[in-house]
Structure formats: structure tokens, C-alpha cells
Amino acid sequence: MKYKLLLWGVGAKYNALLNRIDELVNDNQIEIVGITGNSGIPQSSYLDGYRVVDICDISYLKFDYIVILNDTHFTEILCQICQMLGDTSKVLSYRVFELPGLIFEEYVELKESNLTIISNNCWAGTAYNCLGLECLSPIKNLFITDVDYLKLLHDLKGYFSKELRYKSNAIDPHSGKQYPVMTLGDIEVNCNHALNYEEAIKQWNRRCKKVNYNNLFIEMYTEDKAIEIEFSELEYEKKICFVPYDSDLNSSLKVELYKGQKMFWQAVNSNASRAGLKYDLISLLLKNEIKMRY
């Protein structure tokens, strides 16, 4: 299927991604129906062979998605589109064009599936950010120990229905900053990127409302073989456990540290980011398929 796209924004981001956009057009994955924006738009009918459209006329265009090619003013543009069209469900981030080996149809399928990613640290949030997708998970900017995380996974709905409570403060050994340690029933949730416990509770409650229990992807990393085995026995359709050693379990994948990395979690998280190299993130999340890049 060829998707009709309206590009919103010109400038540095547009110039940086133009060759990638042209490649997808030539590959018949997308069709650019127009380029628009608030500023910097040339007084010309076409730019790089694509039609220039006035913002006032976009409601008359037929398109599948609007792609915002602006990082600095992304939120403001999103609000503007919502005011104009009454909806932002058909808005994509420019980050879609930064994904290596992109199959646009698979990206759209992943977006429309409203996937909730559950992880034991920042991997979920990193993956959403890399893909330019809305975070539909409370597990963002925090970490949970292996044992407590397995408890959570054995009764996800039950734990997510509990109240997140403040327990104490701790010091992040990497940043030296203080952060709130929370409890969710009998498990601890370390909100190591939250400014205070009030913010942690607010963000947790807001994101818990977005969880899609009908489409879950469960991620974990561990250096403990017994934990890995217990994770493999969990009855989730889509799941992956990253380990630093060879494993014959279908739900596990060995990840090595890159040069300059000292902690295993650094290697795990970096592969879910825009710097990731080891596997295809979309194939993993959409089809539970480990598609190696090397």
C-alpha cells in the first residue's frame, strides 16, 4: 500500500531527511501530496518537485498522515493541527524517516496497533521515543528490580490497579541526584528520573490509563539465568529478555556492550534508541521477530 503524506515544515529537519523521503517515494511506499508550514515556505508552487500548499487549504487535501518535520516546535504544531482538524491520530513524527530499513506499512501497522510496552527500566520509553510514538505505558523513566518485576508480570492488571505510594528517597549512583522510591503493593518502583514523588505519581496515574492489555510487548534484561528462565515461562505472546551471555531460549537475545559502555543496561537501552544497531525494533515489537542487523 502507498500512503499519502502531507509534510509540515521546511528547514534543517526537512533538508536532512529529504533524501530519505525521496527514497521512500521512489520505492512506492509513500506519496507526498503537499508541503506546508507556518514559516519558511517559499513563494513557489513546488519545492523539490513536491507541491507547496497553504495551511488554509490542507482540509481540502486527501492524505493518510501528516508528518511534522520540526523538533523544536513539535508540540505547538501538534496543537495547531488538532485545532484545525479536530484530531491528531493521523500525525506522525519526523522520526519515522530516521528509522533504518523502514518498511512504512509495518510502521503504520505498529502505530495503529496501540502497543503497550512493559519493561523493567527505561527501555520502553526509549523505544517509544526512537519510533516517535505515543508512550502507552507507565513504565517510563524508572526501573524495577528483577524479582519485583517478575511479580509485576505475574499479575500486571492487579498491580496496575494498586495505588503508587511514596516510600523514601534514594541517590542515583550515576547522576548523584536524589529520586523518589515508590511502592506498588509489595514491589518497589524506582522513579530515578522524577523530580519528586508528586510528579512520579502524576505521571504514573496518567500513563496507567493508556495501557492496552489487548496488545502488550514485554521486555526485560537480566544477568541472572534463573530469572531468565522464569521470564521465559510467562504466558505473554510477545516478549524478549536481553542477556549478556549465549542462550538457547527462544524468548532471549544476547546483547554485548559496545565500546565505552560499562553497564549491561547501557547496551540494552542503546539498542532501543536511534543509535541502535543490533536488531530491527519494528519487527521485534510488531511481530515478535528477532531480525538481526549483524
Question: Where in this protein do the model-derived segments appear?
Answer:
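Hydrophobic, well-ordered beta-alpha structural blocks that scaffold small-molecule cofactor pockets
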Residues: 1-62, 67-106
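Extracellular glycan-modifying ectodomains
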Residues: 89-294
